[in-house]
């Protein structure tokens, strides 16, 4: 009798563990079922990156002052700044600048803390190469701007799911003239500037009214 009860207990434990594994697997399945039903046919179709996407770093040689702030704030001290001291002007003279994207973690610290804004993040993410040494970009390679997804004639740009209008899951069925969900940062800035100019105009008009009254009293 005791042996039978032990077998029943072992069978129950195995059944419970099997049910747990089954629920875990179905959880992954149900999670994918709630996602977008249509995939992107890459590389003929590409998703439009977000406005704050951290892609390949763009570098402007003329703006760089060789302060090496980017090197100090980098978690792995990645940027290589080659400069010499000009004895006549007693200033740093930049010779070369390079970043190894094989080791870069794209944290954006160098872009955030650059005092002259000579570094910026682009939307380029296609950095695959057969040789890892080719991922070491010098100042010439860093100075090239990538082709935008929306301006590339050989690619069909598609919006990300958060930028689609409410109720639409498939970006392929969205008309080109359909308004996107949310506003671009440039649109928000323009609206804020317009509101600010309206407030300034109202304040100026209110200041002019007492001046006119004073002139009439005189």
Curated annotation (Swiss-Prot):
Its cofactor is [4Fe-4S] cluster. It is a peripheral membrane protein. InterPro entries: 4Fe4S_Fe-S-bd, 4Fe4S_Fe_S_CS, NADH_quinone_OxRdtase_chainI, NDHI. Gene3D superfamilies: 3.30.70.3270. Residues 55-84, 95-124 form the 4Fe-4S ferredoxin-type domain. GO terms for cellular component: plasma membrane-derived thylakoid membrane. It comes from the Bacteria. PROSITE patterns: 4FE4S_FER_1 (PS00198), 4FE4S_FER_2 (PS51379). GO terms for biological process: photosynthesis, light reaction. NDH-1 shuttles electrons from an unknown electron donor, via FMN and iron-sulfur (Fe-S) centers, to quinones in the respiratory and/or the photosynthetic chain. The immediate electron acceptor for the enzyme in this species is believed to be plastoquinone. Couples the redox reaction to proton translocation, and thus conserves the redox energy in a proton gradient. This is NAD(P)H-quinone oxidoreductase subunit I. It comes from Prochlorococcus marinus (strain NATL2A). The lineage of its organism: Bacteria, Bacillati, Cyanobacteriota, Cyanophyceae, Synechococcales.
């Amino acid at each position: 009798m005791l042996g039978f009860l032990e077998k029943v207990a072992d069978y129950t434990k195995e059944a419970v563990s099997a049910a747990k594994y089954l629920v875990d697997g179905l959880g992954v399945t149900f999670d994918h079922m709630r996602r977008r039903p249509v995939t992107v046919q890459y590389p003929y179709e590409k998703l439009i990156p977000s406005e704050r996407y951290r892609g390949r770093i763009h570098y402007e040689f003329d703006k760089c002052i060789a302060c090496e702030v980017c090197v100090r704030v980098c978690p792995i001290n990645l940027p290589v700044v080659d400069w010499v001291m000009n004895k006549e002007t007693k200033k740093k003279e930049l010779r070369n600048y390079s970043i190894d994207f094989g080791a870069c973690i794209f944290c954006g610290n160098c872009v955030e803390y650059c005092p002259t804004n000579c570094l910026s993040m682009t939307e380029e993410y296609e950095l695959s190469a057969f040789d890892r040494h080719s991922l070491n970009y010098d100042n010439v390679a860093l100075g090239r701007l990538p082709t935008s997804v929306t301006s590339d004639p050989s690619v069909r740009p598609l919006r990300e799911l958060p930028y689609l209008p409410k109720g639409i899951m498939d970006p392929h069925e969205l008309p080109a003239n359909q308004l996107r969900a949310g506003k671009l940062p440039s649109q928000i800035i323009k609206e804020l500037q317009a509101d600010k100019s309206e407030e300034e105009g109202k304040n100026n008009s209110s200041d002019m009214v007492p001046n006119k009254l004073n002139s009439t009293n005189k």
